[in-house]
Amino acid sequence: MSRRNTAKKRFASPDPLYKSRLVSMLTVRILKSGKKTLAQRIIYQALDIVKERTETDPLNVLEKAIRNITPLVEVKARRVGGSTYQVPIEVRAYRGTNLALRWITRFSRERSGKSMSMKLANEIMDAANETGNSIRKREETHRMAEANKAFAHYRY
């Protein structure tokens, strides 16, 4: 147990173009080797593609996608008397958003296609329409929690 003060949560500053914290959080997930401008360019291009295809505000589409992907419950391993149980716990809002962003970037990288911006745009649009791999991941997480409901009394 640490004797020091707990670290304060640092919230991401809004991005320069959309003035959105969500976009800047996504930028950090896309970022590789410290190339932030490249990550921002990929995201802005992806949002332009979303705007072109849906003819609506891309920020609203992104927020809807994140809302659709955000899990409500997840399982956490808890060791009790020599055996490990998968204990379902509720996901806090900030962690849920983080998981959603992580899944969007992971599954957009795994997609087939030419550019990362195109793959990211497709994943965002799929998530907004409640299809795609990131939605499947959320459903799988919920199924795991449902299956292990019996161990909920081991909650932290």
UniProtKB/Swiss-Prot annotation:
Pfam families: Ribosomal_S7 (PF00177). Coiled coil: none annotated. GO terms for molecular function: rRNA binding; structural constituent of ribosome. It is found in: Plastid, Chloroplast. GO terms for cellular component: chloroplast; small ribosomal subunit. GO terms for biological process: translation. CDD domains: uS7_Chloroplast (cd14871). This is Small ribosomal subunit protein uS7c. It comes from Porphyra purpurea.
